[in-house]
Amino acid sequence: MKDSMFLYEFDLCRYSKDLTALSLGLLIGASLTVRWVSLSMSSSRDLLHYLVLPLILVVILHEGLHALTAKLSGAKTSLGVLTKYGIILAVYVGINTPLPVKKIRYITIAPIIISIVAFFFSWVTYSPFWAILYIFNTTGIVGDLIVFLVLSKMPSDAIVVDEGTIMKSNAEFPEPYPSWFSKLIIGLAVLVFLYILTNIRIEFEVVGTLPNQTMPVNSHFE
């Protein structure tokens, strides 16, 4: 299919503020739904097990599900990395084969399965590991949700090429939601951030070794 057929383009990066605001909302919302799980980290091993490992697994499983569902739909895929100022912001799977919107929708929303499964296991086992995995994936699905909202308003037979952060189509891309909603979520995110900033309390304990003595040193920040 010739590139000249794809006259319309949708760039997810245009919604960077919305992505940040919605990510904060999903992070808080997901955390509140697993309030029965308590997490305590006392070593670097705990940090690796409860934060680093779930984050790595989420990236692999999330993008892997995109790739798997795309392959099952008969598409060729590619792996890409979104960077800014040399910092990796996101990993994404591009769909190089033109597909109808009805198939792209399933590919886009597929990673929600990870959140459902992780939430179930966190509820059954009370495991902080599964809870953190659930929170990370739910927070990271925000871009997929915006894309899905766009696709849900398009004709099912429209053809789309998904390059990861940019989609091209032979049909016009609608806005995912009204402009007032964008302003609302950004405003709420700013208020929530300011509330957290003014009410946060950080506490840590440093154990220092002095001559002939081990002394705990407590530091508190409010």
Curated annotation (Swiss-Prot):
- Name the chain's protein: Uncharacterized 24.7 kDa protein in gap 5'region
Q: Which organism is it from?
A: Pyrococcus woesei
